[in-house]
């Protein structure tokens, strides 16, 4: 059976296309190395470091107290993982829009980039972290939450076991 040059070219194109697709997928996934360019420990430290800066800024802007914070790995759409520091606090009741603007201004002054896209909370970014601040009336009068999150990433092996079985731990934040 003779193979025409058209068939050979078609197979070569298909092979090249598959190689290009495999390369693109590997580049996008980061090779399983973790979010923010690091492993589990580096991502936890970076996110916690960002929280140690952002949460006190929000606390001061809101004149809040009763701050509690914890850190834990969270699933991103059941496909990958991100590390999150979650803080709750109580602030004097006031005009929510004014309070949100005060928080946003304070964080922007501290070097965060405003990335807010919806009402009733503020979202800012810095390097590989996102901070989101919002009132939380379901928690009681004057309740607010601050989430500081790493970007989502895939992990494998021991790192995957660690993030899948992580339990929340208290984080002490200076105010």
Task: Please provide the spans of the model-predicted regions.
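Bacterial N-terminal signal peptides that target proteins for export
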Residues: 2-16
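Short, intrinsically disordered, charge-biased short linear motifs at domain edges
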Residues: 13-17, 59-66, 135-143
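Residue-level signal for mature regions of secreted extracellular proteins and peptides
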Residues: 21, 69-70, 145
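C-terminal motif of bacterial Sec signal peptides marking the signal peptidase cleavage site
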Residues: 24-27
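Bacterial signal peptide processing site
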Residues: 29-33
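Compositionally biased P/S/T/G-rich terminal and signal peptide-adjacent segments
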Residues: 35-85, 165-175
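Short, surface-exposed ligand-recognition loops at beta-strand->loop->(often short) alpha-helix junctions
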Residues: 90-97
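Extracytosolic low-complexity repeat regions of secreted or lipid-anchored proteins
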Residues: 99-163
């Amino acid at each position: 059976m003779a193979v025409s040059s058209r068939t050979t070219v078609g197979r070569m194109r298909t092979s090249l296309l598959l190689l290009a697709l495999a390369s693109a997928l590997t580049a996008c996934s980061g090779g399983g190395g973790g979010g923010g360019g690091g492993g589990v420990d580096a991502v936890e430290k970076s996110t916690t470091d960002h929280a140690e800066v952002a949460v006190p800024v929000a606390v001061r802007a809101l004149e809040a107290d009763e701050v509690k914070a914890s850190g834990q790995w969270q699933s991103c759409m059941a496909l990958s993982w991100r590390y999150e520091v979650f803080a709750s606090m109580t602030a004097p009741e006031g005009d929510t829009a004014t309070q949100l603007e005060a928080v946003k201004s304070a964080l922007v002054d501290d070097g965060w980039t405003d990335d807010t896209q919806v009402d009733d909370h503020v979202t800012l970014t810095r390097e590989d972290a996102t901070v989101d601040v919002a009132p939380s009336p379901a928690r009681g009068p004057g309740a607010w939450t601050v989430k500081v999150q790493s970007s989502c990433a895939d992990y494998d092996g021991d790192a995957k076991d660690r993030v899948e079985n992580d339990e929340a731990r208290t984080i002490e934040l200076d105010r």
